[in-house]
Every structure is written in C-alpha cells, then in structure tokens.
A protein has these predicted regions:
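Short acidic-hydrophobic surface loop/beta-edge motif
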Residues: 2-6
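Conserved HGGG/HGGXW glycine-rich cap/lid loop of the alpha/beta-hydrolase fold
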Residues: 7-67, 81
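Conserved alpha/beta-hydrolase "nucleophile elbow" surrounding the catalytic nucleophile
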Residues: 28-30, 90, 94-99
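Hydrophobic alpha-helical packing elements
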Residues: 40, 70, 74-77, 131, ...
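Residue in the alpha/beta-hydrolase core beta-strand immediately N-terminal to the catalytic nucleophile
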Residues: 54, 91, 114-117
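Active-site loop/turn elements of alpha/beta-hydrolase fold enzymes
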Residues: 55, 97, 121
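Conserved acidic catalytic loop of the alpha/beta-hydrolase fold
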Residues: 72-90
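Flexible "cap/lid" loop of the alpha/beta hydrolase fold
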Residues: 100-108, 112-146
C-alpha cells in the first residue's frame, strides 16, 4: 500500500475505483486499519473513487507519540490527505473515531466534503488516549480481526 506525506507524518492509504468518479473516503475506528471498510469499498469501487486510510499511529501509517494522537491532529491529517489526493468535494464516511474526525471536518473544512455519514460517534468530547490503555492491551493480545467481521 502506498504511503503519502501529509501534515508532518506518513499515512498509509488505498485508492480504488475510477479516478474521475465522485470520491468516498472511509475513516475507521480507533485500533482498526483500512480493512475495516473492505466490504464497503468493494461494493462502491466500480462506480466511485474509494479511499481508505490508516490514521497516524495505526495500521501501516507512521507510529507517533501519544501527544500527536489527538482528534484535532487526526482531522488535520485527513484534510491534508483529501487535498493531496485531490478528492475535491468527497463523501466522508466515519465510524466511531472516524466519526469524530468527520464532524470536525464538516464544521471546520466544509470546502472539502459534500456529505458525511457519521456512525457510532457523537459530538461529545472524546475519550483520552490513556483511558483506552486496557482496550489497547486486549487488541494487542487478540487482534482486531474478530471484531472487524461484526462491523
């Protein structure tokens, strides 16, 4: 998978479908990677340009210290990715953490997105990285594959 330099980090991404088609960008949940939306990408890639990416610190993207894993930075990464790939007015689809990013993009950068699908998320303040330590440990031991099948 290709890496792209955006916002001071390297982001791993997949870019599928016709390049001149309307674009959909999928933003996964915390602890997941591009495979989370694999089935959805397969369903849309014949008629849409479909971009899936790993957030900084996740999957194949550059590992980062905790102080660079806040939602504002992740939102800036996503905006920079949309601009770098020239997705124009894309449809943004975000689940959980991806939903937090989508809400911020819609409010702060409406020039980048035409529509947003926000799932399993809210406009509440996000949980701190430290509060997720137990979940992080469980996923490191068992992986995310069993959970992805249910999403």
């Amino acid at each position: 998978m290709p890496l792209i330099d955006v916002n001071g980090t390297q982001i791993n991404y997949l870019d599928e479908g016709p390049r001149d088609a309307p674009a959909i960008i999928f933003s996964n949940s915390m602890f997941f990677d591009v495979t989370m939306f694999e089935k959805q990408a397969a369903a849309f890639a014949d008629k849409y340009r479909v971009v899936r990416y790993d957030h900084r610190g996740q999957g194949g993207s550059a590992k980062e210290p905790r102080n660079k894993l806040d939602m504002d930075t992740l939102t800036d990464d996503t905006a920079a990715l949309i601009e770098a790939l020239d997705l124009k007015k894309c449809c943004f689809v975000g689940n959980s953490m991806g939903g937090f990013i989508g809400l911020r993009l819609a409010a702060r950068r409406p020039d980048l997105i035409a529509s947003a699908v926000i799932m399993g998320s809210s406009a509440d303040a996000e949980v701190s990285v430290e509060a997720m330590d137990a979940v992080t440990e469980a996923i490191e031991q068992n992986g995310v594959a069993p959970v992805v099948e249910d999403v």
